[in-house]
């Protein structure tokens, strides 16, 4: 059995734990930066632009049927340096809750931070269905030696 290997081309550097890439029609890519606590646009030439500073730990993004960017925010993580990279560890001391945010231009609002009386812990990724509803995952938090697990 043989595997194809891809040739990678680095477009930009210096992102702070990027996740949730969303390709844009203009050739740019939106990424959330968990450690950077923001939504960033990376242009085809590698230039980076901060779209919105969201706080917490933005962890996944999708374009909604209304054209806005919807973000799963895990509420933040502590990071530890391991050699040249930072690795996420546990819930930070300033953690409040996870949330779902809506970004229009450079402005954002928090749509949800709970569901049926339960706080969102760590929303991770989201997707829109054909009728415009969105689904998201919430994988919980690590608090010291304990893990709080959630669901879709």
Predicted feature residues:
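Cysteine-cluster motifs in flexible loop/terminal segments that predominantly coordinate metals
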Residues: 152
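Sequence-structural signature of mature extracellular/luminal beta-sheet repeat domains
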Residues: 1-149
